[in-house]
From Swiss-Prot:
Subcellular location: Cytoplasm
Source taxonomy: Bacteria, Bacillati, Chloroflexota, Dehalococcoidia, Dehalococcoidales
Subunit structure: Homodimer. The tRNA molecule binds across the dimer.
Natural source organism: Dehalococcoides mccartyi (strain ATCC BAA-2266 / KCTC 15142 / 195) (Dehalococcoides ethenogenes (strain 195))
MF GO annotations: ATP binding; serine-tRNA ligase activity
Gene from which the chain derives: serS
Protein name per its UniProtKB record: Serine--tRNA ligase
Residues the entry annotates as binding ATP: 252-254, 339-342
Length: 413
């Protein structure tokens, strides 16, 4: 969330930032509501002061005037509460300001490829897509997934389930033992205020699964609960930076047009992901972003799968992000670069929404922390890349060397 004072004093900058994102935000309405709020607050202060003076008087005229004032004050308090509620809602719908280093672009087609790592495999045969390989090996069952839950669900069986478990264990081990992240296992159902703090609500409610009776929300990503671990807390500077990693299932409606990405396990209502999350001092956040990208890339390097790094343009960075990078793995069976990680610096956007602050000294005024998030990495697209890059002519799949200690086998046949 942007600071209201910042919007008031930098209105044109905010308008330009919103335009650069190729989106809209209720800036005019925010300014009108802010003006109304201040007018009502001033009138209330005046009437309350007058009521205190009149309360000391005992004549009938003063008593009558006091009664009238109480009624007017009650009306103004109700009106002010309604205005403040609307103002908060509109502020929650304004995206973060892109950093000056982010290229301006109208959509994802203008994202900038920064570099490629690894070489595409030179196949002596035509590589098959993962759905053909998975069904032939009986490690992915699409029909029974649909029978249980409908479209965009699937079942992993046998070595397929073990492969995913091996990937998750490998990623968690690398991030905790080598990169120094603290592992968290959060709830999959969280309160509404958690998703407001993370930036998913109110703007993206239509893409989330919700239990209306209990008002619980299924996590779209572990970023949401991790944002809230320190909600309404004041941290000491010695506690920063804080690095968390969490594995969760993720739940999204993923409303897609018919015919797009309908085959395979690329786009689903439920998928698994290892998430990286950081709290840090404002002056450190962009360095922490580069480190997070390197931590995520190390997974792709270890799996020996070709990948590329993209910097996202202003119109493609997420709602809460000030700067983002995407890591995309190459998958030869579908002949696509698949996004397996998006790493973002949200500056103080989530810190302000979640009210997470820190003090530089015990006597210092609290400041909002900066937060960062990134996939480290996202399944099942990593599964797709592993299956398709490591396939053999007979349809079997070689298990990447780093996964063999977790799998206990060298190949899936």
């Amino acid at each position: 969330m942007l600071d209201l004072k910042f919007i008031r004093e930098n209105t044109e900058l905010v308008r330009k930032a919103v335009a650069a994102r190729n989106t809209d935000a209720p800036i005019d309405e925010i300014l009108e509501l802010d003006s109304c709020r201040r007018t009502l607050s001033q009138e209330l202060d005046t009437l309350r002061a007058k009521r205190k003076i009149i309360a000391k008087q005992r004549d009938e005229a003063a008593i009558e005037e006091g009664r009238v004032l109480r009624g007017r004050i009650s009306e103004l308090e109700t009106g002010l509460s309604e205005v403040e509620e609307k103002l908060t809602d509109r502020l929650l719908r304004v995206p973060n300001i892109p950093d000056a280093s982010v290229p301006v672009g109208k959509d994802e087609s203008e994202n900038v490829v920064l570099y490629y790592r690894g070489e595409k495999r030179n196949f002596s045969f035509t590589p098959k897509p993962h759905w053909e390989l998975g069904e032939a090996l009986d490690i992915i069952d699409f029909d029974r997934g649909i029978k249980l839950s409908g479209s965009r669900f699937y079942i992993l069986k046998g070595e397929g389930a073990r492969l995913q478990r091996a990937l998750i264990a490998f990623m968690l081990d690398l991030h905790t033992r080598k990169h120094g992240y603290t592992e968290i296992y959060p709830p999959y159902m969280i309160k509404r205020e958690c998703l407001v703090a993370s930036g998913n609500l109110p703007k993206f409610a239509d893409n989330l699964y919700h239990d209306a009776e209990e008002d619980y929300w299924w996590v779209p990503t572990a970023e949401a609960p991790l944002t809230n671990l320190h909600r309404d807390e004041i941290l000491s500077v010695e506690q920063l930076p804080i690095h968390y990693v969490a594995y969760t299932a993720c739940f999204r409606r993923e409303k897609m047009s018919a015919g797009k990405d309908v085959r395979g396990i690329k786009r689903l209502h439920q998928f698994d992901k290892v998430e990286l999350y950081k709290y840090c001092k404002p002056e450190d956040s962009f360095d922490e972003l580069e480190k997070m990208v390197a931590d995520a890339e190390e997974i792709a390097d270890a799996l020996k799968i070709p990948y590329r790094l993209k910097q996202l343009v202003t119109a493609d960075i997420s709602f809460g992000s000030a700067k983002s990078y995407d890591i995309e793995m190459y998958s030869p069976g579908v002949d696509e670069w698949l996004e397996v990680s998006s790493c973002s610096n949200c500056t103080d956007f989530q810190g302000r929404r979640a009210n997470v602050r820190f003090r530089r000294t015990p006597e210092a005024k609290p400041e909002f922390v900066h937060t960062l998030n990134g996939s480290g990495l996202a399944l099942p697209r990593v599964m797709i890349s592993v299956i398709e890059n490591y396939q053999l002519p007979d349809g079997s799949i070689v298990v990447p060397e780093v996964l063999r200690p977790f799998m206990g086998v060298d190949a899936i046949c």
